[in-house]
Regions:
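Long, intrinsically disordered, charge-dense linkers/tails
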Residues: 1-186
Length: 186
């Protein structure tokens, strides 16, 4: 629960009810319920951007134009490791975080089943989706920053904050993040 605290609070702020399903066999139960009842679907609070957990007709308008998004994506791809992250540009609430890391529901469920004895998939690679909030002020700042060094620092800091929120920042990467953060507040 503590690892997903920010995601839980964001979902509650949107008016969603959040269930705590933390039993080792819950993945099998969810699969059974979703298979038997076609109108039931479970989503993790950290499985996607909160705007996408429950599909709605209303679309959030992006502050960035399509051309600006097309210009921004390669700038982010140049800094973010492509072997671990798929980058997705989305118009979310401007109060949400600039970068959000999610793991596709299917990949996570397969991994959990493997851990509880399924074992059929071998070792699943860690793949994540990096959702870039095109309505966040910092993302606009990244796009409009003139110097490459500053832009890369903003992207790396935002990525590391997103990784930290998912407990993915460890070892040398964590040490580098802490040192960079100290430099930023000096």
């Amino acid at each position: 629960v503590e690892e997903q605290h920010s995601y839980i609070e964001t979902a509650k702020d949107k008016g969603y009810k959040v269930l705590l399903l933390d039993s080792p066999i819950i993945a099998h139960l969810i699969q059974k319920l979703e298979g038997d009842k076609e109108k039931i679907a479970f989503s993790r609070v950290d499985g996607d951007a909160v705007e996408n957990l429950i599909k709605k007709e209303e679309a959030t308008v992006s502050k960035l134009s399509d051309d600006e998004k097309d210009a921004l994506k390669p700038l982010i791809e140049a800094v973010v490791p492509g072997d671990k992250y798929t980058i997705q540009m989305e118009a979310m609430d401007s109060g949400n975080l600039p970068f959000v890391i999610t793991q596709p529901e299917f990949m996570r469920r397969m991994k959990e089943m493997q851990q509880t004895g399924g074992g059929m998939m071998g070792s699943f690679p860690e793949m994540f989706t990096l959702i870039v909030n095109t309505n966040h002020e910092l993302v606009g700042q990244i796009l409009n920053t003139k110097t490459t060094k500053k832009r890369e620092r903003l992207i790396q800091q935002s990525l590391d904050l997103a990784r930290l929120s998912q407990n993915l920042l460890k070892g040398e990467a964590l040490t580098t993040f802490i040192k960079r953060s100290v430099e930023l507040i000096k």
